[in-house]
Amino acid sequence: MDRIRIVGGQELNGVIQISGAKNAALPLMIASLLTAETLTLDNLPNLADVNMLLRILGHHGVDHSVDGRRLGAAPNASRPVHLTARDIVDTTAPYELVSKMRASFWVIAPLLARMGEAKVSLPGGCAIGTRPVDLLIMALEKLGASVEIEAGYVHAKAPKGLRGAEIKFPKVTVGGTHTALMAASLAHGHTRIVNAAREPEVVDLAECLVKMGARIKGAGQSVIDVEGVARLNGASHRVLPDRIEAGTYAIAAAMAGGDVMLEGAEAGLLQSALDVLVEAGATVNVVNEGIRVQRNGAGLMPVDIVTAPFPGFPTDLQAQFMALMTKAKGQSRITETIFENRFMHVQELARLGAHIRLDGDVALVDGVERLEGAPVMATDLRASVSLVIAALAAEGETMVNRVYHLDRGFEHLETKLGGCGAIIERLSG
């Protein structure tokens, strides 16, 4: 199993190219199931999750190629990928596939909308009553689907097609909004999505669906209107830049000090995070090429944050920002409002010398003068990169274990940081 070795204390200086957004790429790829024609996606990141989803889509009959050549289960997804679901060969998504990636549950919407039936395994680890797919199921039922949950599978049927309706989410849900958009695009009549997620990745999906012939208005606002159409066509679409990757490297630059250009990053996608970095003591400039982040040795200041749906501070940057605050001059308060149990990185940061106290959904971080390298273990995607950020400022060597979590969401992380002066290497075995 791979590990990443980091020797801290080096400034970061250089250019980091921001990849396409994983959180946009996955629903865009799933949208290929809505049409028999080819959907071409450019700027797909070359990530474990992207390549796994290609395998899952292939199970349903999606053919994928790059530069006109059919490839295996793990293509070089950094080039334009052509996805063609000419024939849906299976409307069942089995547990052994869905359990590998939670987002793959979203295939239920296009399969149901196009074929009138879908049977999809509940994602691994879902507890009845608290599972995040409840709102997705509610959206499908509002559109007229009959849904049964049996033996760990969600079986949805709409033999006469889906019918437009008002879908009012009790809380903001990105996955629910993705599901509603894809299903409503092929439903009969008008659908209104109320309390819709406003995330840029939702807007990106809507823009792609419109290119495919969908009639959608209001994406990026809390109310979205969809007028269903009989069929969707193929299209070409470029995945938007990854705001979470950009925010992560911006935080890394603030942590290590130095001068980093985030090429291709769009400030409008992560303004709340950039504002917080400025409060903490970094200098942030938006230029034609992207975003430039600098910190010249001045100490970090403590800043309180509360995670919130877009345009608030993203929960996917919470762990990274906590790592930054471990070196601030004073106490910061971090409140997590989106996900339960998203402080799994705290114990591992403590192994590096961080002082963090937990009280429910609040973490109180008392900044320390020095962090010290140590062996640590990644528990999930965002937690793993928070350990890398802390290690950049720690004295001595840090070994991050279980880095397969990193590979799910960060393209060539050690190469990008190493190119800016970090002492970082991947060790196999």
Swiss-Prot record:
Single Gene Ontology MF annotation: UDP-N-acetylglucosamine 1-carboxyvinyltransferase activity
Chain positions found as 2-(S-cysteinyl)pyruvic acid O-phosphothioketal: 126
Domain of life: Bacteria
Keyword Transmembrane belongs to the record: no
Signal peptide segment: none
Binding site for UDP-N-acetyl-alpha-D-glucosamine: 102, 131-135, 316, 338
Reactions this protein catalyses: phosphoenolpyruvate + UDP-N-acetyl-alpha-D-glucosamine = UDP-N-acetyl-3-O-(1-carboxyvinyl)-alpha-D-glucosamine + phosphate
This protein's pathway: Cell wall biogenesis; peptidoglycan biosynthesis
Localization in the cell: Cytoplasm
Keyword line: Cell cycle, Cell division, Cell shape, Cell wall biogenesis/degradation, Cytoplasm, Peptidoglycan synthesis, Pyruvate, Transferase
E.C. no: 2.5.1.7
GO biological process, one term: UDP-N-acetylgalactosamine biosynthetic process
Enzyme class: transferase
Function: Cell wall formation. Adds enolpyruvyl to UDP-N-acetylglucosamine.
Family classification: Belongs to the EPSP synthase family. MurA subfamily.
Protein name, entry field: UDP-N-acetylglucosamine 1-carboxyvinyltransferase
Lineage of source species: Bacteria, Pseudomonadati, Pseudomonadota, Alphaproteobacteria, Hyphomicrobiales
Name of the gene encoding the protein in the UniProt record: murA
